[in-house]
Amino acid sequence: MKVRPSVKPICEKCKIIKRGGRVMVICENPKHKQKQG
């Protein structure tokens, strides 16, 4: 899980979702998981 000021999809399987008011990227590749913070 990476915490960054701006989250962007890295590959075509990355999905941007909102969880509890936080923007996150979920993906099949665990290296692509990101959280905004």
Swiss-Prot record:
**PANTHER family, from UniProt?**
50S RIBOSOMAL PROTEIN L36, CHLOROPLASTIC (PTHR42888), LARGE RIBOSOMAL SUBUNIT PROTEIN BL36C (PTHR42888:SF1)
**Swiss-Prot/TrEMBL keywords:** Ribonucleoprotein, Ribosomal protein
Question: Which PROSITE patterns does the record match to this protein?
Answer: RIBOSOMAL_L36 (PS00828)
Q: What are the GO MF terms of this UniProt record?
A: structural constituent of ribosome
Native source species: Alkaliphilus oremlandii (strain OhILAs)
Q: What domain of life does the native source organism fall in?
A: Bacteria
Q: What GO cellular component is one of the record's annotations?
A: cytoplasm
In Gene Ontology terms, what is a biological process of this protein? translation
Q: What SUPFAM superfamilies has UniProt attached to this entry?
A: Ribosomal protein L36 (SSF57840)
Pfam families reported in the protein's UniProt record: Ribosomal_L36
Q: Give the record's family classification.
A: Belongs to the bacterial ribosomal protein bL36 family.
Q: Which residues form a coiled coil?
A: none
Q: What is this protein called?
A: Large ribosomal subunit protein bL36
